[in-house]
Amino acid sequence: VKDKKIVCNDFHLKDPERIIVVTGPNQGGKTTFARMFGQLHYLASLGLEVPGTKAQLKIPDRIFTHFEREENVETLYGKLQSDLLRMKEILDNATKDSIVIINEFLSSTSLRDAILIGKQILEILTKLDCFGVWVTFIDEFSSYSEKTVSMVSTVDPADPVKRTFKIVRKPSDGLAYAIHIAEKYGLTYETLKERIKS
C-alpha cells in the first residue's frame, strides 16, 4: 500500500518469563502481534526462515490457539461454555514444549468472573512452563507472576485516536482510549443527548 509504513515489533523473553500478556486499545495491533508470534514459531518449526533481523525461537511440539469463533447453534452451548471447553482441550494437551496463543478469551462474561477464570488458567499455563501470548482487556493478567510479561499496544501521544500498531514492553496502563473513538464518531454522551432532543 502506497505511503503506508510497515510497523516492526520486537519481543523477547528472559528466564523465567514465559507468557506475553498484550493489552491496550482496540484496533491497535494486538491480534496481529499474537498471529505474528504464532507464525514465527510455525515457520521456524518447518525449518524455514522467519521474517526479522534476528530470531532465536523455541521449536514447539504443538501450537495451540484460542481465537474467537462464532457460536455454533447445533451444540446448544453458550459462548462462554464453548470457549471454556476449547480452553480445557488446550490445557489438557499442552506441554512445556508447546506454544499457546490466546486472543480476547473471556470477553463474554463479567469482568469479575473473567479475572477469576483467567487467573486459574494462568496458574495452569505457568505450571506447565510453556511459552505463549495472551491478548486481553484484563490488565491484571500482565503482572500475574514473574512468568508473565506485559506488552502494550501504543497510540500516538498527540492524537490518541491514531494507533501506532507498535507493541512495546511496559506495564499495562489500563487505558482503552474508547472515549476517543466515541468522540471520533460523534457518540459521546453530549452529542447523543443533543440528537435525542432534536
Question: How would you describe each model-predicted region?
Answer:
Residues 1-198:
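ATPase nucleotide-binding head domains, primarily ABC-like/P-loop NTPase cores
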